[in-house]
């Protein structure tokens, strides 16, 4: 059931941090949260895109928006983000970063590059969950939403490190849900199989999935809306219309 705007603001406001907010599902989260009256911290590498989204949200919803231009794969990404957020009371942290820019066989990408993906999908997730979660627990309310992938459920050829790191985030989220659910802090994993974004369709093309550019996929807005509605019903959510494309040959 949907949480009324005033109740949602009280439980998860006044500030929400959306890591990976420049486009797709992250931008959809930002718009939906702004509509509910939450101030937003927008985090991504693309400062120009974030600036455009900031202007849109401020003008349309009369909220405050902070832009943080940050590569979340850097070793000090969480430290820099926390410094930028400062004393703003964050009641909701959404981690939506973490796509695989390589989509190659394991040995065809350097260990250094895999290390960056490991930091993006594991280290920064852990550090931010630790920092923001501690503050929420101290206040006795808040929410943590980890946007993951159905790829976390099993290994896939050309996605070895991606599936492994997404498995880490899935288990972290479910464990934190068990630890925090009786202490006022909601935790939800949103596992996305497919979504109608250019990034997803390009990845499907690289994986040689038939009709990757034309098949009907769930909309980013629908995924974000459902996740916010179900935030209090963790630990893990899959949109009912989001069925991961079968790539059995990729598992061989």
Where are these regions (language model features)?
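Conserved glycine-rich cofactor-binding loop
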Residues: 15, 22-24
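Conserved glycine-rich Rossmann-like NAD(P)H-binding loop of the short-chain dehydrogenase/reductase
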Residues: 36-52
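Substrate-binding pocket helix/loop in short-chain dehydrogenase/reductase
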Residues: 104-106, 113-115
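Active-site helix of classical SDR
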Residues: 129, 165
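Residue(s) in the substrate-gating loop at a strand-loop-helix junction
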Residues: 149
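Active-site-adjacent segment of SDR/Rossmann-fold oxidoreductases
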Residues: 154, 175-186
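C-terminal helical subdomain
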Residues: 189, 205-248
């Amino acid at each position: 059931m949907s949480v009324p705007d005033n109740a949602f603001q009280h439980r998860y406001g006044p500030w929400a941090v959306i890591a990976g907010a420049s486009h797709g599902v992250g931008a959809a989260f930002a718009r939906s949260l702004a509509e509910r009256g939450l101030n937003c911290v927008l985090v991504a590498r693309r400062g120009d895109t974030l600036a455009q989204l900031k202007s849109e949200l401020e003008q349309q919803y009369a909220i405050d928006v902070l832009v943080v231009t940050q590569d979340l794969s850097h070793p000090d990404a969480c430290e820099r983000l926390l410094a930028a957020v400062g004393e703003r009371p964050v009641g909701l942290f959404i981690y939506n970063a973490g796509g695989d820019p390589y989509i190659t066989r394991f040995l065809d990408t350097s260990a250094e590059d895999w290390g960056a993906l490991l930091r993006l999908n594991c280290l920064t997730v852990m550090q931010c969950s630790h920092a923001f979660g501690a503050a929420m627990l101290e206040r006795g309310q808040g929410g943590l939403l980890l946007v993951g992938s159905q790829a976390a459920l099993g290994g896939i050829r050309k996605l070895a490190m991606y599936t492994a790191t997404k498995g880490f985030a899935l288990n972290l989220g479910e464990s934190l849900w068990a630890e925090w659910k009786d202490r006022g802090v909601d935790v939800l994993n949103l596992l996305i199989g497919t979504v109608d974004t250019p990034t997803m369709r390009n990845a499907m093309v690289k994986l040689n999935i038939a009709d990757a550019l034309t098949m009907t996929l769930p909309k980013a807005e629908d995924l974000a809306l459902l996740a916010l509605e179900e935030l209090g019903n963790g630990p893990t959510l899959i949109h009912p219309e989001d069925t991961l494309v079968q790539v059995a040959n990729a598992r061989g």
